[in-house]
Amino acid sequence: MTVEQFYEFCLVNRDLRIERTASGEVIIMSPAFSDTGNRNGKIAVQLGNWAEQDDTGEAFDSSAGFTLPNGAIRSPDVSWIKLERWNALTEEQKASFAPICPDFVIELRSSSDTLKGLQKKMQEYIDNGVSLGLLIDRTNRKVYIYRPDREPEILDNPETVSADPELPGFVLRMAKIW
């Protein structure tokens, strides 16, 4: 499916969670289960509050789709983009699946997600320009930290996860996410 066809498909199916792979394959996902949506909200609030105070970037929830350099259109559970990069986009670009890869992404594994599938998605984000990615695996109480040119760092049952130095001062509190 082309980008234009994908956009039209999304407009007609606003109630679906849809992504597009780099090869044009359309992935239709079920809505998040209530508990996952609640935890995604808690993560988005923490990042959003930090972003408002820090004022160096814009935070996004899972409803935002981005066109990555490889052509995939992805919607991370939570993401953040440096203000100068976001402001470099035209208003028309911002009002679509913006052609930009976030600087920071978080994916929260739900019971319908496979760990392997999310790990592949996190690597795709890194390969397309993400500076820092967090994969939160509630089932096993692990956080996988992704950075370019490194193997993922794995934290076992952390109370907090620091996003330094990429997002100075942002610390994700895990108590209400587990």
Model feature map: region roles:
Residues M1-W178:
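Gly/Pro/Ser/Thr-rich low-complexity, intrinsically disordered segments predominantly at protein N-termini
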